[in-house]
């Protein structure tokens, strides 16, 4: 091991929020997470609202976001517990005078709360999202007592919607495909579901400004036309409220792509700030033709501050916005090196990165974990926008894609984002539809899979086994 490399391995760029013990391994010190622990005690997020008000949509999106920023979160959907306990027949199961069904529903709630306790207290979960109607003060009191007994914080999210068109669209988009209505006539489904809503309306008790003034909550009116926020008490609740005030349900598409092939891509060198190759310039014009063919209304174009994304955007002939946050991951001392050179000069660092690619931070550079934090403002703004084309870089595109597709931190660094390919993301009910469009301009392959042997003592041949070909 060279003296230079030894110094790099032992002298870390410190960005550590949580101190590690002095006996930590080299890998622990290299990981050096920059992610703060957002929770000092677990949080229960409690959904409130009548059926067809978007509670599951909100639960799913919020869970995806919190997991993406590094806060372990899980949804507990009471409807799933109910379906496991009893087969659904019709709306009469939800009648307030159906005492037998009321007992079953309460037992399902208690079973779900038991699983919440297991997740938050034994499985190192930080946030549990309790996705149910919770429309009565009695049910909410039961949950509050449960949270108090176990030392959990509670944050309520109430979705209120009185617009018949929005409610009808939600029923059409989601409920017609519900497991409760498999192989049922659509008109009968609509009739039954509207009667189900009427059953809940009888005893619905919204969160009250005076009676519930001591509680932490956000009320969302008509899918975001107005908000009411009360007693936000910590970081998780603050981020949750801010996130919910930025999302919308307007139909749109997000186009993600990398810059055209660069001169450094051709030579197998990572990072740097080189311009486009001849094929990269050809791709830029192909991208312009593709975007024009889509006939996208009010399209916004975003790039990083790096030459290769700007040159790609210039061919579009439209205004574009530059984001420094979209710059490629900083490879530190390894900038503009080939993988072969990194293995030759810093073999231990190369192995450490393969062992935990998400948390590994390049000496004097960044990790994917750092990059996710850098990109959070981009995600917030993407959620606020309608149609956007983001021209970015491989690591950046992986992070953005992981958010929209709900990929784990283990999967994120290995998502395939090839050059000269556009990914069209269209948000749907509880996820995102992805279309991959290759624009028929050849480019080098820059994707490197995780090698089988990640041990520090491995041979160079094993370390370089998955390195793609380059000039």
From Swiss-Prot:
In the C-terminal section; belongs to the phosphoglycerate mutase family. The keyword Phosphoprotein applies. Beta-D-fructose 6-phosphate binds at residues 82, 105, 133, 139, 175, 196, 200. It holds the Pfam family His_Phos_1. Residues 251-471 are annotated as: Fructose-2,6-bisphosphatase. It catalyses: beta-D-fructose 2,6-bisphosphate + H2O = beta-D-fructose 6-phosphate + phosphate; beta-D-fructose 6-phosphate + ATP = beta-D-fructose 2,6-bisphosphate + ADP + H(+). The modification N-acetylserine is found at residue 2. Residues 2-250 are annotated as: 6-phosphofructo-2-kinase. ATP binds at residues 49-57, 170-175, 350-353, 394-398, 430. Keywords: Acetylation, ATP-binding, Hydrolase, Kinase, Multifunctional enzyme, Nucleotide-binding, Phosphoprotein, Transferase. The active site is at residues 131, 161, 259, 328. Synthesis and degradation of fructose 2,6-bisphosphate. The keyword Lipid metabolism does not apply. This is 6-phosphofructo-2-kinase/fructose-2,6-bisphosphatase 1. InterPro entries: 6Pfruct_kin, 6Phosfructo_kin, His_Pase_superF_clade-1, His_PPase_superfam, P-loop_NTPase, PG/BPGM_mutase_AS. Its EC number is 2.7.1.105, 3.1.3.46.
